[in-house]
Structures are given as C-alpha cells and as structure tokens.
C-alpha cells in the first residue's frame, strides 16, 4: 500500500522523523558497563525455554529469552539485583546477582516442574499441558499479534501434515484435497496471499502458476513449532495480505542434554480397506569441548493408499421448467500418496557473541492416482412424459474416461547465516537458496464417447442428485474411442535471498532501533509437453479394453459401470501406434498454452524503532519493497482451429510499495495484554495471471470480417494492497490458559478477478472483428474483510481428582467481506472467505493417559464466479477427530486415533445450497502406533 494513499510522502517523512526523534529522546540513558547474561531452563526436561519474561526488580529493566533460552540485560550500574523469570504454566523463579562495574555475570534460571495453582501430584509440564503453555508463552511475549502451535500439540491429533495441524488455530481454515488439508487460509484470505517461511526464511511453492505453498507436502513430524503472524512488523516480508506462516524446525540448543524421538504408525481406511503407515525419527546433540557445536537430524516418511468417490453436476440451466444440471459426472479415485521429510541443521556457537548456522530442509511429496469417470449428458433429443421432477429424453450421451497421473513435488531449502551479539548490538546475516519443483512424469487421459442419441433415458430430480436410467448405458460396445492425451509437466522455481538485520538495544529489551535490507530473486518456469491422438484408422471400442468398475460406488447408492483397463489400453496403444491418428494442432497448443518464464527481483529495506512510553510498548517503522519482474510466454493464434503462429511475447512490471506500520502492546494489569496494530501489506499476482500469455481463436465469417475470442494474462496487473487494522485483548489464566478477543479489518485495493468483455466492430492486429470476446484477469476497485476472533483455553486443575486432568480449547471466528466487482451489482465476498470458523477440543491428561476429542468447523466459501446466482461455493464442513495415548514407561507411549469419525464429505453448490454441484466422500480412517523419546 503506497503511503500516499493516506497522506503525502513528504508529510510522512516529517512524521517519521518526529517519531524517531521522540523515541530517541525517550530512550536516552546513561551507559553502564555491567551485564547480566543467562538462560532459562525447564527443570523437568532440560529444554531451553523461549519467550520467558525476565525482569530486574530494582529498576524494572526487562528482557525476553530467545530460542536458546538466552537473555541479556546490559548497561547495569554496579550493585545487587534480583532477577525474576516468568513463564506460562510455571511458578516464577527469582535469583539474586551481584554486578561489578564491568564484566558479565552469568545466571541460570531453572523453572520448576509443577504447573502453578494447585498441588498436582503426577501432573507435570509435559504433553498437551506443556504444549499449550509453550504456545501461550510465545503468543504472550510476542511483539505483535501471533498464533503458535508447538510440536507436542501438533502430535496430539491425527494430523498428517502441517496444514491439518494449523486449522486448529483461531482465524485459520484450510482447503482440503482428498480428505487432507492442503492450503492454509488465514482470516478468509486466499492462500496465494500468505507468506510461508521455514525458520523465518523465505520458502517457494512448487506449483505451476500460483504463489501458494501446499503445506500437505510438509510432514507434521519434522516441525518443532508453527507460528502464524497476523499483523506484520517492518522486518518481515510484506507479501502477506492474510498473514505469515513460519514453520520452525528443531535446534540442538533447544535441549542441551540432547534429544531423540520417533514413532511408527499403521492405519486403516474404511473406504478402501487399505493400511497406510508412517515412521519418523529425530535426533539432536551438542558436541565439542565446550558443547559449541550442535546437530539435528530428522527423517519422516509416510505412505497412504486410499479411495474416494465423487458425484458432480454439470452446468445448471433450465430443464423442463427447473434449474437442473445438464449432465452428471461419476468419479472414482484410487490414490497413493507418499511424503518424505528430511531435516539437517548444523550450528556453531564458538562463544557467547557468535552463532553460525546452516539449516537444510527437504520434502518430497508424490501423488500417484487413477481416476475413472462416467459423464452422462441426459438432456438430449425430445422431452416426453414430463413432470415437475422427472421426464424422458429420446437421446443421451455417455463419456467414459480414465486419467492416470503421477505428480512429484520436491522442496529444498538451505538457509545459512550468522548472528553476532555483543553489548547493545545484534547483527544477523542470512542467505537462502531454495529449490521447488513439480514434476509430472505421467499424465495420460483416455476417453471413449458414445453418439448423442445412444442412450434414451428417464431422469428423476427428487433428490440432491439426478437418478438417470438408460438400459444400455453400461454397455462398453456403445463407447467408441475419442482421444488419448499424453502429457508431462516440469515446473521449476529457484529462489535466492540475501539479507541483514541490525539492532541496537537501548536501556531495556523493549527499547531498540532496528534496520535491515533483503534482496530476493525468483526464477520460475513451466514447461509442458503434450502429445494428442484424436481418432483411430480402424474402429476401436471400449469393449476391447474395458474393466469392471467399483462395486460399492458411493456406498452402493449408484451403479458406476465399465471402466478403462489402463494396462490393457496402454498395451493396445504401444502395440498399434500406427492405428492412432495424431492431432498436431492441439498437440502444439496444449504444449505451449501454459508455458512461461519469470524472473522476479525484490529489493527491500526497512527501519523501525521500539520504545516503552508510559507502560505502552510502541513499535513504529516503515518497509519499502521494489519489485522488478520480466516475463515471457507464448501467443497462440488459431484461424478456424488451424494454428497460424506461436510467437513469444515478453512483458514486465516495475513498482514500489511504501509500507508503514505501528504496533502497540500494553499490560495494564497482571495477566492482561492489550494489542493494537496498523500495518500495510501487499499480495503479488499469481504467475499465470501476470505473464503475457495469449490464446487467440478466430474465424472469418465473411471476406475481411472475423469473430473470435482471446484468453490472456495481464502484465499490467497491480498487486493487492491491504491496509490492516488489528486489536486484541488477551487475559492469561492460571495455570496455563487464555481468554482472548481479537478484531480485525482489511481494506484491500486492487483485488484480482477474471473479466470477460465483448467488443463489437473493433480492429485488433490489423483485422476487423464484428465480435471479439476477451477474458483476462483485471484489478477490481477494492474490497474489505472484517472479523472477530474469540479464543478460550484452560486446564481445569482445580477440579477434584480425577477430573483435574481435564482441559478445554475452543475458538471461533466471525468474518464478513465484500468487494466491488465489474459487471456485478450483488454482494460478492472474497474467494475462500468463510463467515464462521470454529474449533472445540476437550482433552484429558493424567495417570499417563492423554486423550483429545476435537471438532473443526468451517462454513461455506466462494470458490469460483459464474453467472449471477450460480457462483460455485464450497459447503459447510464439520469434522470430528479423536486421539489417545498412554505412557507405558518413561519415554515410551502407545497411541491410537480416528480421523473423520462423522464421515464428513466435501460438498460444493451453485448459488443456492439446494443446487448441489458435487459431493466427495472419504469415510473414516484409524491408526495406531508407538512413540519413544530418549
């Protein structure tokens, strides 16, 4: 968001200078030479505690422990001081130190093993309680509005990947694929507009035309913590209209005594009867003469083979006086998914000032699926015997298809850097190389289609789906070969980043100056190769390669019919290649229509200051990002279906965004934290939207007069620009709970939607068109998103035994949005924005038993725009999950889980919930296993 949107640039510079001057005067203090430096440790586990609040009682000076549990308070006069450490879920600990006129006083604060508030017997800070306490402490001491989820909490539900895990957080939902979470939606903002980082460093996405990162590629086992920042500070990448999602992997310095943990799981899927499995192992250790070196190695692998069934309606139109789908599609999926994750982190701390690191993260996600489908176009020919809910047609067409596809996504991230901290100065240097690739070595589509009058039929529309009956619909001899398309895709994105951050601490931790810069370059390409065959020289019927379809399709409610036997069809193709007629025109166009090359460079710099003014911590600053990008893609030109040219088109964009922000944090009373923030963020357009691709189809209707259509990208697109207002009130409960309220508002300029324009009597490329229809993405005017977030978590340790092991976690989000969209007068929400989100989890932890029952709710959201009244929505979804574990002995647990207990499907509808567009069913899954720690 350009600052000139709110006030002139000159006025902003004057205001920023005044603010900086005021902050510096407020921070003026005499520099002393003494320093207290130490770390905070969990007495039970030896883990170093991040986010502990430290305070020197004599002068009120404060600090917060970093990830290694370390903290420092410098510039102290000689004398005796009392240091107190506070951490959610633990009793405060104090220690007295004597500081000389110069030098460093080391200190170690060990927080006790019992939760505060009661005598808890064998309830120690482990499992769900410790996970909740750590996440709440990160949230409590954060300088901005953040949600956190620790590794233990991730493992307390049957979450297969990072997306499944974070949907439990306030204001967060997910879009699912085949029953698993895939993309994260923060506060109703599309996943393309979120920033994803690993250990705070940028991470690319492997998919072809989008910027989103599919978090189902990350096994949840290799993650130490997930953080979602909802209000960004100037030192964070600004490409995050929704928020910034940070995946944190383990460090050997998290637990100086070393650690190791792993698990093995085997499961059962009710739909397929198959047995998925998974295993993971992580190990971390310090070594060297002074434990100055640290290494963490982690490996995770899972295999899941399962099935799903889908029924989908075609486009709705008037049929016999009703709005009905003009066709119905039956799809049966057989899927194998494998996930592999590897973490290799290396660190070196030669002394208290220096830390050097090299973090390596690798994930591999392989999806191998076969999809059988039957499409029935029933409303052909003459309609007779019509009633309000049924009728008979003299014609009908069937299409039987098989899609065999394998997609492999790999993500590699190498993040290396150093931190130097001495006295008030902290310098961070970092560099990133990231490689993201999506390889489709096989996508083969076989299609057999009947004549238009092959299947006279009767239909009934009394239920959510049509009941279509035709006596010969399942006769494979009625389906001649139509085409086979063979495709490979190679998507590659290489990302390079260099940056630094320099911080100068003034008289206490909340008072500092900070500045930094970062350069990011992305090189992305998409190369598709298609080979199409659209006929045979001699007749080829489905009956020659048919197989038996599923016997229990859609829980035996529908009959599927014959399918394409893939090995048999491939054998016929291989042995009779000369019989298949190639289609060179569509081979070329399908191969080039998605191809592009992108080079995008972003140079960013920021400055910020933090000051505590009358009990309120103020962080104010500005970030400037300059984007410089060049693109190339193909211009496909077709006259009467014949390809006439494929020139390469070039394009580019240049723009600068000035992004100020102010964050306020106050603790007006013990355990109450108030926050407010004004921030500005951007969302760069998707690659497929902004590259200069064009598909130009036209016909000559008379001499020198043409009619045609254009589908193209738009290099002139502006980025989304979002002005964000946030407020939150957080009250922290004893022993480890919270009641919180959050309000947010986003004013978003330049949202991007596809627009179709009909032009009459116009000239383009030197040719006269009586009608030219152009479809391309364009910036709409503006839109808003606003919402309320409620969160409650508590551990009921005050109840009598055995009920003192109970706990509850519940959150809800109410959201609304609207946008001004060309050609529409109705109220249009943002894509994937749900009006309501909610999570409820009841857990119990005592006597070595840990159990959690959790319900996740998401209301419907807009998926795609069609004609008014027929927009595509994803319907409400409520999923119930359960997991329990039992500690057999110290370090060894057995566990079991059930996912999707209520057998919740995924549904879509068109405009009105009565117009069901599709329903996909997965059934429930169960798993059991053993975990260990050493």
Short names for language-model regions:
Residues 236, 252-258, 288-293, 353, ...:
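Short loop/turn motifs that connect adjacent beta-strands in outer-membrane beta-barrel proteins
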Residues 207-212, 221-228, 235-318, 323-326, ...:
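Outer-membrane beta-barrel translocator/receptor signature
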Residues 857-864, 885-934:
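C-terminal beta-signal and adjacent terminal beta-strands/loops
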Residues 743-748, 757-759, 763-862, 902:
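Gram-negative outer-membrane beta-barrel transporters
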Residues 41, 45, 55, 86-88, ...:
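Short, acidic, small-residue-rich periplasmic hinge/interaction motif at the N-terminus
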Residues 394-413, 590, 594-603, 653, ...:
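Outer-membrane beta-barrel signature, preferentially recognizing the C-terminal barrel domain
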Residues 163-202, 230:
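Extracytoplasmic beta-strand/coil segments of soluble accessory domains associated
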Residues 59-72:
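Short, acidic Ser/Thr/Gly-rich low-complexity loop/linker segments typical of extracellular
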